[in-house]
């Protein structure tokens, strides 16, 4: 689970969207998850039943629900080795991502084999700002709050990035963040 060090969110959210980093993700360690479905039923789903793929699970579309509990099968390692790998991952995140700025994490899923941040950078969008929402100068796949950003500013900037990448590269950019609630 060392790959997850520094990923913002919860275990339930990580299961919901198959969170991952550094070449691994939740699908590689999940045995089963207890799910509360939209209809109010609660049931265990196995890893296979979760139908994981890149940053998605069955919970996002076919069987909407939330993860209440998760059983994970982790690899046994020496404590020092685990701590060292976690620190390495956190350090990498600090060096390459704007973790000191208010943001929601990675905005777009990587349109494999491309990398979302690289596409945004190559399109010349780093530093582009709408209202208080700004594409990070450090990493193109992050939108930071440059001061007073509203949800609408962020949504407008996301839409602008999607439109620009589609026009320049004919690639559809899908959000990794889940947008819920009112957009104020």
From Swiss-Prot:
Reactions performed catalytically: UDP-N-acetyl-alpha-D-muramate + NADP(+) = UDP-N-acetyl-3-O-(1-carboxyvinyl)-alpha-D-glucosamine + NADPH + H(+)
Keywords for the protein's UniProt record, in alphabetical order: Cell cycle, Cell division, Cell shape, Cell wall biogenesis/degradation, Cytoplasm, FAD, Flavoprotein, NADP, Oxidoreductase, Peptidoglycan synthesis
Keyword Lipid metabolism assigned: no
Pathway: Cell wall biogenesis; peptidoglycan biosynthesis
Keyword Glycoprotein: no
Similarity field: Belongs to the MurB family.
Known role: Cell wall formation.
The protein, known as: UDP-N-acetylenolpyruvoylglucosamine reductase
Protein species of origin: Bacillus licheniformis
Lineage: Bacteria, Bacillati, Bacillota, Bacilli, Bacillales
Gene: murB
